[in-house]
Amino acid sequence: MAPIIVPCLLLVVLVLQCSVINSLDYCSLCRGGRGEHVGCGSPGFSSDCGQKARTRKFTKEHKKVILDKINDVRDHVAKGSWGLPVASRMKVIVWDEELAALAKRHTQGCVPEAYKCRHTLRFWSPGQLNFEFYADKMPSTMSLISTAIKRGHTQKHNITRDIIEKYQPAGPKGNVKELALAISDRVTAVGCGLTTWKLGGKARALLTCNFSSENDYNRPVYKTGNSPGEKCIKKDETFKNLCSAQEPINPNEHNF
C-alpha cells in the first residue's frame, strides 16, 4: 500500500496549496505603507509588457531542472566547496505552488523591481530573484532557465567566508545576492514564474523565483559545522550532504 499512500499525500499537499492560493485575500496582508501585495487584484499584464505578452507554463521537467540545479549547488556548498565553510543543517528544497503563483503574478508586471509586500501566511519574509532577458529571438523556456542558473552560479567566484558569516549582497569581488539566497539554510522551498513579450523590436523575458526566506543583513547565510549535515535528522539519498526534504526547518526563524 505504501506506493499508493505517498502519491496521495503529495496530492493532498498540492490541493491544499492551490486552495490557499485561490481563497486567500492577499490584499489584507499588507500593512504599514508596504504597498500593494503582488497577489492583490485581478491578474493580467501591465502596460509595460508591450506586445504579445504571455506567461509560460513550467512543466514537471522544468521544475525538476530548477530544483536539481539549486540542490546540486547547495550540496556542493554544504560539503565545503569553493573554500566555504561546511553547512551543518542545510536541507533539500522543494517546489511550492503558492510561491510559484506569486512569482508568475510578479512577472506579469514585466519589470524586475520587487514588490515590497509579497509575504504569505506560511512564509513571512520571502526572498526573490529576478532575471531579465533581451534577444532578437526568444529562446526556449529551458534555455532561459539554464541561462538564469548560470548567471547565479558565476557568483561562486565572489562569495567568501565573511559573507557566509555576516551576509551582504555584494563583496569585494562583486554581487553574491543570487547565489547567497540559493544556499541559505533557512530556505525550504522555491517557486518560479516566467513571462515573455516583445518591445522595441526585441524579444524580452522576466524570470522570477520566490524563495521561502530571504537572507538577513549581517546574519549567517547558513550555520556551519565540522561535517556536512551533522545536525540533520536524516540525510537526503541523492544529495548526500543535505538534510532530507522532511527536515523540520522553520523558514521564518532567523539565524544568529
Swiss-Prot record:
Keyword rRNA-binding among UniProt keywords: no
Modified residues (Pyrrolidone carboxylic acid): 17
Residue ranges constituting the SCP domain according to the UniProt record: 67-211
Tissue-by-tissue expression: Expressed in salivary glands.
SMART domains: SCP
UniProt cross-references to InterPro entries, sorted A to Z: CAP_dom, CAP_sf, P14a_insect
Keywords linked to the UniProt accession: Allergen, Pyrrolidone carboxylic acid, Secreted, Signal
GO-annotated cellular components: extracellular region
Signal peptide: 1-16
CDD domains for this protein: CAP_euk
Domain of life: Eukaryota
Broad class of where this protein is predominantly found: secreted
Cellular localization per UniProt: Secreted
Family statement drawn from the similarity comment of this UniProt entry: Belongs to the CRISP family.
Protein name in UniProt: Allergen Tab y 5.0101
Species per Swiss-Prot/TrEMBL record: Tabanus yao
